[in-house]
């Protein structure tokens, strides 16, 4: 992680407004550390530079979920999923719905993601970690 973080920060030192790099660093921090506030700041900057980018909205929705901000998270993830119904976005949206007790909706989102990409590892990891059985 440290080498990757150093590389991304080196890019940002040369181009502090590189939205894809801001997003990559923020998303990596979200998934590999508990530095969620820092990750959110990076991804928020990325989204300000590239509004409407579904990948960045997914990242920001995911870090908001990690911060317990479920309403904001769900809103961003739904918008990202509508624009780009990628299975990874589906995995994140499903997990946010599950955390809010909306289990049927979560299962529907995960099943849709698995229809798009059978055996998608991120969806399978989420449902396994949460102990979910899909029909």
List the predicted regions and their residue ranges.
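Bacterial c-di-GMP phosphodiesterase catalytic domain signature
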Residues: 26, 80
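Residue-level recognition of tetratricopeptide repeat
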Residues: 18, 53, 86-87, 120
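Structural signature of tandem alpha-helical TPR/SEL1-like repeats
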Residues: 1-10, 33-45, 67-79, 101-112
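Structural marker of alpha-solenoid helical repeat scaffolds
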Residues: 14-15, 49, 82-84, 116
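Canonical tetratricopeptide repeat
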Residues: 24, 59, 92, 126-129
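Register position in tetratricopeptide repeats
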Residues: 31-32, 66-67, 99-100, 129-133
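TPR alpha-solenoid repeat register
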Residues: 21, 56, 89-90, 123
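Hydrophobic face of amphipathic alpha-helices that form TPR/SEL1-like repeat modules
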Residues: 27-29, 63, 96-97
């Amino acid at each position: 992680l440290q080498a990757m973080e150093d590389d991304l920060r080196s890019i940002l030192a040369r181009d502090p407004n590189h939205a894809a790099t801001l997003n990559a660093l923020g998303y990596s921090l979200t998934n590999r550390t508990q530095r969620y506030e820092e990750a959110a700041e990076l991804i928020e900057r990325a989204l300000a530079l590239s509004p409407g980018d579904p990948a960045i909205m997914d990242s920001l929705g995911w870090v908001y979920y990690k911060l317990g901000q479920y309403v904001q998270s769900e809103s961003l993830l739904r918008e990202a999923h509508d624009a780009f119904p990628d299975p990874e976005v589906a995995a994140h949206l499903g997990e946010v719905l599950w955390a809010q007790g909306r289990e049927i909706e979560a299962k529907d989102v995960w099943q849709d993601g698995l229809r798009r990409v059978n055996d998608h590892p991120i969806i399978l990891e989420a449902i396994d970690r949460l102990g979910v059985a899909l029909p």
